[in-house]
């Protein structure tokens, strides 16, 4: 199966470094900066056609995490065919005169698009009790550090 992309003026075709990679690298279509303690939305000038029965997730890259940047996860449903965008947040604290933000240039990889097959679920149903499991309702670190 191929994944169809429509490039708007200045958009860069997403790629995978290796055929077995989970995500398609998403590229910045222009230069920009994410200032410390700030968020920046980057329209990618790219549209994607997610096949029916699948969903696309915009995810961060580990190289950005090392710089104090978080990519806010985006969900792309199969019915959406408009321009996709990435939201980056810089967690670095403001320190006068030391470091004002992270600079990106046209063509930099800024996020990745991961495509996942959806489970075949009909509808949401309210019930009085859920099935018992080994884990139960333990969450938020209940299985260890």
Where are these regions (language model features)?
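DUTPase catalytic domain/fold
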Residues: 1-145
